[in-house]
Swiss-Prot record:
Binds 1 [4Fe-4S] cluster per dimer. It catalyses: N2 + 8 reduced [2Fe-2S]-[ferredoxin] + 16 ATP + 16 H2O = H2 + 8 oxidized [2Fe-2S]-[ferredoxin] + 2 NH4(+) + 16 ADP + 16 phosphate + 6 H(+). The gene is nifH. Belongs to the NifH/BchL/ChlL family. HAMAP family: NifH. Pfam families: Fer4_NifH (PF00142). Its EC number is 1.18.6.1. The lineage of its organism: Bacteria, Pseudomonadati, Thermodesulfobacteriota, Syntrophobacteria, Syntrophobacterales. This is Nitrogenase iron protein. The reversible ADP-ribosylation of Arg-97 inactivates the nitrogenase reductase and regulates nitrogenase activity. Keywords: 4Fe-4S, ADP-ribosylation, ATP-binding, Iron, Iron-sulfur, Metal-binding, Nitrogen fixation, Nucleotide-binding, Oxidoreductase. GO terms for biological process: nitrogen fixation. The key enzymatic reactions in nitrogen fixation are catalyzed by the nitrogenase complex, which has 2 components: the iron protein and the molybdenum-iron protein. [4Fe-4S] cluster binds at residues 94, 131. The modification ADP-ribosylarginine is found at residue 97.
Length: 274
């Protein structure tokens, strides 16, 4: 079983990318569980056809300790298994603690047991690794492979660089490695070349360039992944390609985060000022 966490700047398209990739893997016959690690609980919505799923924390609040595995997971597109950690009420408590509670409960209930015959577990993690709770999947070795969703925008690259610093911090203790960058295009000038150069500097690869296409939004409005909504569309093939590349990937590295000055220089060389 491969344990993969998807990180990236808030709003970069992590949840959309994760769900479409999971749809691609599930379509290939892989058994995949997705664990949403975001208080918004929107990491599985497209796989579930828009159904709002009761989160682990909400279930614990209402059911107490008397919780069974099927209370906190639902079956989505192509038999994918969907779990949402959830979070505290806004302004109260720590969302990072919610992730820790949720993953520990899943372990106790046997969600990762060999009898479940999982090929993949994906953690869709909120934002940056500034908070210990959100770093939990890599800190505790729950995830062994990290993919960072990035674009050619400056703040997305800053966030990716910071996430790499977090990976380095936990790499030796937790055994976590970076599998690559996924460029979720924003149609920035020289974007593909810039992210390829950024990946080289980090000592990793741009595993896939996902072009920007309105079909993604169209599918989301219809509460589906692109692969389910329009399986013959070229954008569906992009996500299938990403799924296959992750399946075949054997490049797992401890990244070499860039100094801020060097990152800004790369942006100037390849970016809008080029």
């Amino acid at each position: 079983m491969r344990k993969i966490a998807i990180y990236g700047k808030g709003g970069i398209g992590k949840s959309t990318t994760t769900q479409n990739t999971v749809a691609g893997l599930a379509e290939m016959g892989r058994k995949v569980m997705v664990v949403g690690c975001d208080p918004k609980a929107d990491s599985t919505r497209l796989l579930l056809g828009g159904l709002s799923q009761k989160t682990v924390l909400d279930t614990l609040r209402t059911e107490g300790e008397d919780v069974e595995l099927d209370d906190i997971r639902k079956v989505g597109f192509s038999k994918s298994i969907c779990v949402e950690s959830g979070g505290p009420e806004p302004g109260v408590g720590c969302a990072g603690r919610g992730i820790i509670t949720s993953i520990n409960l899943l372990e106790q209930l046997g969600a990762y047991a060999s009898t479940q015959a999982l090929d993949y577990v994906f953690y869709d993690v909120l934002g940056d690794v500034v908070c210990g709770g959100f770093a939990m999947p890599i800190r505790e070795g729950k995830a062994r492979e990290i993919y960072i969703v990035v674009s050619g925008e400056m703040m997305a690259m800053y966030a990716a660089n910071n996430i790499c610093k977090g990976i380095v911090k936990f790499a030796e203790a937790g055994g976590v490695r970076l599998g690559g960058l996924i460029c979720n295009s924003r149609k920035v000038d020289n974007e593909k070349e810039m992210i390829e150069a950024f990946a080289r500097q980090l000592g990793t690869q741009m595993i896939h360039f996902v072009p920007r296409d309105n079909m993604v939004q169209r599918a989301e409005i219809n509460r589906k992944t692109v692969i389910e909504f329009d399986p013959a569309h070229s954008q569906a093939d992009e996500y299938r390609s990403l799924a296959r590349k992750i399946e075949d990937n054997d490049m797992h590295v401890i990244p070499k985060p860039m100094h801020t000055d060097h990152l800004e220089k790369l942006l100037i060389e390849h970016g809008l000022a080029a």
